[in-house]
Amino acid sequence: MSKDIKILAIESSCDETAAAVVVNGRDVLSNVIASQIDIHTKFGGVVPEVASRKHIEAIGIVVKEALEEANVTFDDIDAIGVTYGPGLVGALLVGVQYAKSLAYALKKPLIGVNHIEGHISANFIQYKDLKPPFVCLVVSGGHTFIVHMKDYGEFDILGETRDDAAGEAFDKVARAIGLGYPGGPKIDKISNEGNENAIVFPKANFHDKDCLDFSFSGVKSAVLNYINKMNMKNEEINRADVAASFQKSVVDVLVDNVIKACKLRNVDKIAIAGGVASNTHLREAMINAGKKNKIDVLFPAPILCTDNAAMIGSAAYFEYLKGRVAPLELNAIPNLKLGER
């Protein structure tokens, strides 16, 4: 395709209101994010109704800023991309309705994007020459998957969590040891001061040796039990040791399973995606495992790991090339599965 395709992308699945302009799925002209983290920190987590109200306040502003920063107008835009699931239904609806209104008023194609596919596509922005097939570990507050990306927009799910997502476990453990919200970055930071071998927390292993699923409820419960026992004994809890030991348990399982996935599918490339992909200990462990097994390990920049609209613009471009235009009846689907249309 000789003509550059400019996508205006919108993301509002949780607590970030974001808009971006992306060219040909890989070049970001703008990536504007209005974060609500300071608001939700007061509540110890995301409050859905508050998130929705803040999206309504911010969405028009971030879209305007994204266009200005990219030095383009609506006339320059070829299609509107928007996250329509999974996520918080009220939050998703704000972005979907806004995108539908723009698409209708401007007579532009509307592209519905799966939020998880967006996270995976962040790697296409970071690595301009990256092409499928590859294995991707998607690890965030709400999702933990191992995916084989066979082609653009074509996925096999090789493994997923059977209970808590990894990021969810991080948040709950952080709250239990008094670190507050958001838990992931705080555990990552305090772990640098702790001994990761101080406490042995369990790692979920399933009977089927080829099983690539995860379970993080056990290690989360083990941490809570450890804290309760220490409190009953009136003994001081070393938060850094607890955080480091918990983190090691989670990271070890993530690394082991994704390396196993590459070997099972005979793939020599791993892309990491999602908010937890910013975790410095996960990055270090994945890089070391990749070197040991002669597998390339790819990470997006931290700004592309957390929720943003540039990744949605990338995914929307590849959907656009396949002719997957959404009807104006597009609705938010909070439990949307990867690969569903």
Swiss-Prot record:
GO cellular component, one term: cytoplasm
Keywords assigned: Acyltransferase, Cytoplasm, Iron, Metal-binding, Transferase, tRNA processing
Cofactor comment: Binds 1 Fe(2+) ion per subunit.
Entries under Pfam families matching the protein: TsaD (PF00814)
Residues the record lists as binding substrate: 138-142, 171, 184, 188, 279
Catalytic reaction equation(s): L-threonylcarbamoyladenylate + adenosine(37) in tRNA = N(6)-L-threonylcarbamoyladenosine(37) in tRNA + AMP + H(+)
GO biological process: tRNA threonylcarbamoyladenosine modification
Cofactor(s) the protein needs: Fe(2+)
Gene3D superfamilies to which the protein is assigned, alphabetical: 3.30.420.40
Coiled-coil positions: none
Family matches, as InterPro entries: ATPase_NBD, Gcp-like_dom, KAE1/TsaD, Peptidase_M22_CS, TsaD
EC top class, as a word: transferase
Keyword tRNA processing in record: yes
GO molecular function, one term: N(6)-L-threonylcarbamoyladenine synthase activity
Binding-site residues for Fe cation, renumbered to this chain: 115, 119, 307
Subcellular compartments: Cytoplasm
Record-listed E.C. numbers: 2.3.1.234
Family to which this protein belongs: Belongs to the KAE1 / TsaD family.
Purpose: Required for the formation of a threonylcarbamoyl group on adenosine at position 37 (t(6)A37) in tRNAs that read codons beginning with adenine. Is involved in the transfer of the threonylcarbamoyl moiety of threonylcarbamoyl-AMP (TC-AMP) to the N6 group of A37, together with TsaE and TsaB. TsaD likely plays a direct catalytic role in this reaction.
Protein's name according to its UniProt entry: tRNA N6-adenosine threonylcarbamoyltransferase
